[in-house]
């Protein structure tokens, strides 16, 4: 369109502009109107807090981002969800704009909800995340497994650690380390007779334990010696549970200990002549 000599482009193409003076003389001019360029800044992106995003424009002659950058691609690290504006200029000097939004998601924070992050074999701990939704995983299922935030310690021979990770639906992660103490094993003679020998039990074939770490569930069957670690004193017939609790980790282990009654001795009266002899025979009662 033309108004008072000012030509305004309406759509792309060529237009002939004619001027006629008061004497009837005319002059013409062909005006070319270039279309606006198509400018894009890429699809909206979602990042985790503390991460960065790369924004890339469609190919233009000149670029002007709202950040002040003038390159085709820029890297941004917003702390909150932010929309970025872009002005692109083509070879004809025509400009157009575009926008792209970078959504920022919080990082999950993982903590112990119930229990402790240091576990004995078979124990559990419940974890929680500050972000809802998502999945849990363990770096080593042979050390600890996790389901719904509940971690279960597996059997290990030495103190071991596993990293438990929570991954949100936005693929943002938070983690915590759990420690699993080694499984203990009681070994030695697990039977005795009332009045008989007093066996000494071992932990993982190691005698360096303390007497206070041992206990018996039934003092009427057997007690533990107060001064000698692992020494069991049979008291009466029956079965008792012997427990060893590690002084450092507080992890317990148990074993059944059986005590049998002492054999009974019975005799009959037999008369012999003076200077005679008698053969005595002992027969076990059981």
Q: Where are these predicted regions, by residue range?
A:
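Short, solvent-exposed loop/linker segments at the N-terminal edge
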Residues: 45-51, 117-123, 191-198, 270-276
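Solvent-exposed segments in extracellular or luminal domains encompassing
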Residues: 5-14, 72-87, 91, 149-161, ...
